[in-house]
């Protein structure tokens, strides 16, 4: 947990705002976990859980972090493993050697990109439905009949669990007439996606990827961020228009704020924005 910046960022953010909730999502897994699956599924599941538990334990020991959510599947999986999700829920519920109550950790699934297969499986499988608290979807502002049913009948939260951060540098795009903050992936376009994601998908959270970036000038995704920190050795950072756009939402809708469906609207169009 000390090899990358992520856990340190989380600790710094919690020091500023203790009410922040934390979600753990894996993009891969160590080779020793993958090798365990060559022995049997049981060996693989046990190895993967040991790795996750060791991470949770270390994050608490080193940084004092308590995680509220775990995304059960690997990022943007194309194959949902129901058996693993149920195994993870069972092990967390029966964990007796933990620095805090792991039974309270909620599961998010399944961080798919552009699809909602997990929702249909949850409708058909009551055990899976009971194990999962949040449906996480990537890069879509839309739900479907299954996500709507799970939200309305079963109280499952729907998250836009990975969405683009604004991708333009406002100082290079704004015009003399104060236009220019528009276009695909602009700050206004991302604001439009946040608005549309509730009206069209019942999504109550938008997670930026990335919120903080340290890409060098000219690198792929270089302008994609809320906060740019390409020179950490100097202490310099830049807040672009996306940061202030996000603040409009976070300051307007504090935790616990409720949506009034009749007062919400989004035209369902993505990759566009009001021009003035």
Where are these regions (language model features)?
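Substrate-binding cleft and catalytic face of glycoside hydrolase catalytic domains
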Residues: 1-124
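Substrate-binding and catalytic surfaces of secreted/luminal carbohydrate-active proteins
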Residues: 53, 57, 79-276
């Amino acid at each position: 947990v000390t090899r990358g910046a992520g856990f340190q960022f989380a600790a710094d953010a919690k020091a500023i705002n203790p009410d922040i909730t934390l979600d753990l999502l894996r993009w891969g897994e160590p080779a020793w976990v993958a090798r365990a699956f060559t022995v049997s599924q049981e060996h693989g599941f046990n190895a993967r859980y040991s790795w996750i538990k060791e991470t949770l334990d270390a994050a608490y020991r080193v940084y004092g972090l308590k995680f509220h959510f775990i995304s059960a599947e690997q990022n943007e999986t194309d194959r949902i493993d129901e058996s693993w999700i149920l195994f993870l829920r069972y092990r967390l519920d029966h964990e007796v050697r933990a620095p805090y109550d792991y039974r309270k950790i909620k599961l998010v699934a399944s961080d798919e990109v552009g699809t909602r297969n997990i929702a249909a499986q949850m409708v058909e499988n009551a055990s899976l439905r009971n194990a999962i608290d949040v449906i996480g979807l990537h890069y879509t502002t839309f739900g479907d009949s299954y996500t709507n049913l799970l939200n309305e009948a079963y109280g499952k939260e729907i998250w836009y669990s990975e969405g683009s951060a604004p991708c333009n540098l406002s100082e290079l795009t704004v015009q003399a007439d104060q236009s220019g903050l528009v276009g695909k992936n602009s700050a206004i376009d991302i604001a439009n996606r946040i608005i549309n994601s509730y009206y069209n998908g019942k999504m109550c959270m938008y997670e930026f990827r990335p919120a903080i970036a340290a890409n060098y000038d000219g690198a792929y995704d270089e302008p994609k961020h809320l906060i740019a920190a390409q020179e950490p050795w100097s202490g310099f950072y830049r807040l672009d228009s996306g940061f202030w756009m996000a603040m409009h939402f976070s300051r307007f809708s504090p935790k616990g704020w409720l949506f009034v469906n009749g007062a919400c609207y989004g035209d369902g169009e993505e990759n566009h924005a009001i021009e003035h």
